[in-house]
Amino acid sequence: MKTLLSFLLVVSSALAAPPSAKEILESVRLRQAQQELNLQGLIREGATIVPFRLTQTGPLIRYSFTKPDEALQLRLGDNDSRLEEVTREGVEKVTPAQFDHKVRGTAVTYEDLALKFLYWPNARVTGENSISLRNCWKLELKAPNRQSQYSNVWLWVDKEGGALMKLEGYDWNGKLAKRFTVVSGQKIEDRWFLKEMRIEEFDPATGKQRARTYLEIKK
């Protein structure tokens, strides 16, 4: 009887075990790559408003801007992502040296759009939290090299839908550099999608907020 009880406890513990960080990140990438979208959006920072069009066909996501005409497109692969600049001259890959470039002068950088952290191999699940009333897995991701402006990223992933609910990026001195938080969501074609995200940029030296930006998506 004691042996049977011990066995049942082991089985119960195994069944209750959370998914690994690798499994969670794979599900996030899969979810991201399965969407078909054609939406309007804007980046709002103080008096600055940057409208854009968001289109997606499977693993290809494009952010299109005007005045001047320009686009950034993201290709989500199985093992890596590729961010590209699209201009009248053609298509050019965004290099790590350009990761800190700001999108139209806002706090959003090229690296933020590239989603490279979703492919970092050094990742672990550290616990669970509730973000905007959603139950989330909390993950710690460590950069594989210094090509990133972030040494590590804390990520909160919705347990039910695999959506990214919150992200904190830390610089190479371990100081908080940027925080992304989903403020609200919306249903588009029976799927949950981002409606508004708050992006906070911090001064690593003082810890004070340097900029607050909002990214909004409209149906």
Residue ranges and their predicted role:
Residues 3-13:
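Sec-dependent N-terminal signal peptides
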Residues 17-26, 30-36, 78-151, 171-174:
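Flexible, processing/modification-adjacent segments and terminal tails
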Residues 37-41, 52, 61-63, 151-153, ...:
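One face of beta-strands
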Residues 42-46, 64-66, 84-88, 142-144, ...:
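A generic structural motif
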Residues 134-219:
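Gly/Pro-enriched, hydrophobic low-complexity segments
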Residues 41-77:
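N-terminal, post-signal-peptide region of Sec/Tat-exported proteins
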Residues 28, 53-56, 182-187:
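Extended lipid/amphipathic-ligand handling interfaces
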